[in-house]
Amino acid sequence: MKKVYICSPYRAKDGAELDRNIDYAQQLTRQALEAGLAPITPHLYMTQCMDDKKPEERARGMAAGLALLKGCDFVIAGVKYGITEGMDREIHTAN
C-alpha cells in the first residue's frame, strides 16, 4: 500500500472556514483510503493536541508533519480553497 501525504488548507479566518477546511481534509483522506492508499493527514490530528494559533506549537507540528512527508510515496495537494503558507512549504519539501 502506497503512503500519500494529504496537503490542504487548515488555518482559517473564522470557525465556519475552519470547519470547511477540516471537512475538505477529511474528504481527501477518505478518497485516498477508498483508492487503496495509506493517507497521512497531519493537520487532522496534530491540531487535536497542539494549538495551531501558538507559533511555537504550530512550528513543532509543521516540523513533525514535514518529517512524515519525507516517508510518503507522493503528495495529494487539495487546492480547492487555495494554497496556504503551510501548504506551500509542504509542496516545496515534496519536490
Model-derived segments and their meaning:
Residues 1-95:
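Catalytic phosphate/metal-binding cores of nucleic-acid and nucleotide-processing enzymes, i.e., regions
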